[in-house]
Design a protein with these regions (language model features):
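Short catalytic/ligand-binding loop motif for oxyanion handling, primarily in non-cytosolic enzymes
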Residues: 8-12, 47-51, 72-74, 101-102, ...
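Acidic, His- and aromatic-enriched active-site or binding-groove loops in soluble protein domains
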Residues: 1, 35, 56-94
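Residues lining hydrophobic/aromatic ligand-binding pockets adjacent to catalytic sites
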Residues: 18-36, 42-71, 107-116, 124, ...
Length: 172
């Protein structure tokens, strides 16, 4: 996953600066992890079709991830892979904000009707997407872990267990 190097709003002000920052971030990811990012994420998931066209023109990304906002999607689901208008190859991955926010903000809220959130319960929610999508994109900021959800909430154990619980279900 790549983004702007300085977590900036450079796309809004200078496309040259924007491309330069992305290139710098790609270099950093490659240096530290030995990987070339294939998905782009703009600062705070800010998106428009012009951004997608610029990202596609860079020819180094397969997809871009952004919000799955209800007011934009209307009747459509964030749980499908879309193609940005005007793009031929770039895919658009939409954040499932409801399931993401269940982890990021509601996980340790004892007043939440679904508390406690366990890995097996969450895996069933993910599996329930079947028939209304073929992908669930969960996206949480790093501040989820340590600022919103402290270690003593069980968030780390939940995150370790979740993939295995999802894969246990036959439809996944």
């Amino acid at each position: 996953l790549a983004e702007t190097y300085y977590h900036s709003l450079s796309f809004l002000y200078s496309h040259d600066e924007f491309v330069e920052q992305i290139s710098k971030h790609i270099e950093a990811i490659n240096y530290f992890f030995g990987q070339r990012p294939r998905v782009f994420r703009n600062t705070e998931l800010i998106y428009n079709n012009d951004l997608a066209a610029l990202i596609e023109s860079m020819k180094c990304f397969d997809a871009i991830i952004t919000e799955g906002a209800d007011h934009i999607l209307g009747y459509r689901s964030p749980n499908f892979v879309y193609q940005p208008k005007g793009c031929e190859n770039l895919k658009l991955l939409l954040k499932n904000y409801s399931l993401s926010d269940d982890i990021a903000f509601r996980f340790s809220n004892r007043d939440w009707p679904q508390w406690p959130l366990t890995a097996d319960k969450f895996s069933r929610w993910v599996s329930n997407v079947n028939g209304n999508g073929n992908v669930v994109n969960l996206f949480m900021d790093y501040e989820t872990f340590g600022e919103h959800q402290w270690e003593d909430t069980g968030i780390s154990s939940f995150m370790r267990a979740m993939p295995g619980e999802i894969l246990k279900l036959a439809d996944n």
